[in-house]
Amino acid sequence: KSLLLSTFESLFKYGLRDFHGLEIESLWKDENTYQVIRLDFSNLKDFSSVEEFSELLDQYLLDTLTVNRLVSPIKTDKEGLRAFIGWLALQADNSVVLLLDEYDTPLTSCLNKPELFDEVRKKLWRLYAGFKQWDGAIRFFFMTGIAKFSQTSIFSELNHFTDISLMSEFGSLLGYSHQEVQKYFSGYLEQASFQLGIEKEKLLEELTLNYDGFCFERTATQRVFSPWSLLKFLNFPSNGFDNYWYESGGQPGVLLEYLKSHSTLKPEEYESEKQVQLDDLALSAKFSLLEDKVLLAQTGYLTIKAVRGTTVTLGYPNREVSVSMARLYAEVILDKKAINRAGEGYLADYLERGDLRAFVEEVNRIILGIDYQAFPLTSEASCRSALSIMVSSSSALITARSEVHNAHGRSDLEIQTDKNYWVLEFKFCREHDSQESLLQEAVRQMKTRHYGKQLAKCNLIRAAMVFSQKDRQFTRWAEVSG
């Protein structure tokens, strides 16, 4: 989004100066240049009171006017907001281009503080009302953000906005399509293929698995790569398919704080199918009614998978994001000290080495760090989900899938590493159940339903595991052969 604003800034400020030989050269018809004001509200997030926010906003707007040589650098006696609106009021018709990046950062910074949210909203209302009052001076206004909040008034004051967020015409605007990747990055793909020692087709498969899959439009037919992650990979292919999600701003701390009190971050929700109404994605929401699934879609953790009528199915776009989401879940079910001690990275090593005992013992050690009051493991499903989160967060090179179907049934958890393919079957032992009987039942189920046999070309490891509700540990396990 920020790169798009940079493109607009150059076009309106300098015309085609920076775009000779590019497709826009034949499409851009405006021969005039304009005073371009670019506001980046991602700078307005470090505050704990409305007074601190007001001071931040006023100083930022004054600095913007000063940097653009629109007011004297000598301190004005006006607050920054009044000075900015006053300047806009003096401009000629259609002479100003306003670009507002991350408009909602001040609001998302206080998602978990409703009273502060409301005070910040009122302060921003004055700015947006000024835009509306003097919109005759504005030739073009483009705004980006994550969430849409109806009480901010930007969607009512500026009610002549065209919201392109879910329009199919703009579905590939903020990402690279497969065709674009193969057309414009062919040389980079060949270099990466050579450095990694894999065929170009295999390289594209891995890139798709890791960085593709984002869908931003209501027909659910266009999918694009994350530009940041793809470009980082192409710059340093020797690093392999690293996870760049957090580098692209994919883990705002306030999101974590907000979601801690919502059901979406219960372990059993990690792999569940999530559905929302199309209007929930398309329309602005009241703060008090903001749905956590919608927020996760707006922040990129979930993307549109399918649209049937007015119902939207959401899911993780790719491995990079599903791993990042697993880490977000791990942040919640384990406190930070527990994460630092838990050693999820060891899980990846044990899975790669095929060491079942070490794997189970490490899982049990991590379980000790889970807050039982907040996240009790009370069923086979919750155990499966917790283990899936641990494994998925342990390495970007490991893929975990729950309830994988074959012709005879569905296994609990299947895990792909570089060398091994694990198939796990769980049983949940309540206080008066026989652990040994449950273990043998899981072994029989694994054998009679042939779990994993369709993957005979892989180094297959199959294991049955019993979780004791009383001990809160996996107390029985066995590798299944034959």
Where are these regions (language model features)?
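Phosphate-binding site recognition
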Residues: 1-379, 394-397
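Active-site metal-binding core of divalent-cation-utilizing nuclease and nuclease-like domains
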Residues: 88-92, 396-419
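Structural motif
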Residues: 97, 420-422, 461
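Mg2+/Mn2+-dependent nuclease catalytic core
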Residues: 117-122, 428-452
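Feature representing long, continuous alpha-helical segments
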Residues: 381, 385, 389, 421-424, ...
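Conserved catalytic cores of phosphodiester-cleaving nucleases, focusing on short active-site segments
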Residues: 387, 411-415, 419-432, 449
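Short secondary-structure junctions
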Residues: 391-399, 455-458
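Nucleic-acid nuclease catalytic cores
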Residues: 438-443, 450-478
